[in-house]
Amino acid sequence: MSGRKKLTPPTHFDPEYLFKKYELLRKSVYKKFKDKMINQSDREDLMGTIDQIFLQLVSEYNPNRGVDFPYYIKRMLELRTYHHITKYLKRINGETSLYVKNEDGEVLELQDTIADMHAEEIFSRIVDLHSINPYMELGEKHRNLMIGLFIRKKTLQELAQEEGVPLDRLHARLYFLIRKFEKEHQIDTEIFGEDLY
């Protein structure tokens, strides 16, 4: 043996080791959200905030929950950063700016798409629920079903007539939409360790 002292490898969940190992993840989350910041100073602060969120998530991680660390850290870092950005925009704007995409892929502000303030409030609640998990994507038919039920206040029967499909098909679509929300809710509950809703 040489006179070199053998270093012990860092523990798997050593914050300093993980901080270096997941540098690219932190940078990619920063790139994803940096354009939401109003000015350069806030953009610079965002990287520090992402680093703090990362270290907090490392300390909160519980390997006994059965969730792989890479999946947990990627999903939670993006989710917490998303919530940080949402709070930041609310603070800057004094309100929530909601944006939606139309069928042509154009991004429109909510006030351009919904005139009724009551409908905007309902839509805001749906978006707030959905924002708990911003990665869950709804297909066009599920999205239209939610808009029809919650914003346009139509019955399933009316929506089936408009679409020209049997009522049973919309019942099935609603059933699968609810199952999708339940599945995503279960995943989030496992990750967060508590009921968020």
UniProtKB/Swiss-Prot annotation:
Molecular functions per Gene Ontology: DNA binding; sigma factor activity
Presence of the UniProt keyword Transcription in the record: yes
Record keywords: DNA-binding, Sigma factor, Transcription, Transcription regulation
Task of the protein: Sigma factors are initiation factors that promote the attachment of RNA polymerase to specific initiation sites and are then released.
Protein name: RNA polymerase sigma GP34 factor
UniProt organism field: Bacillus phage SP01
Gene from which this protein is expressed: 34
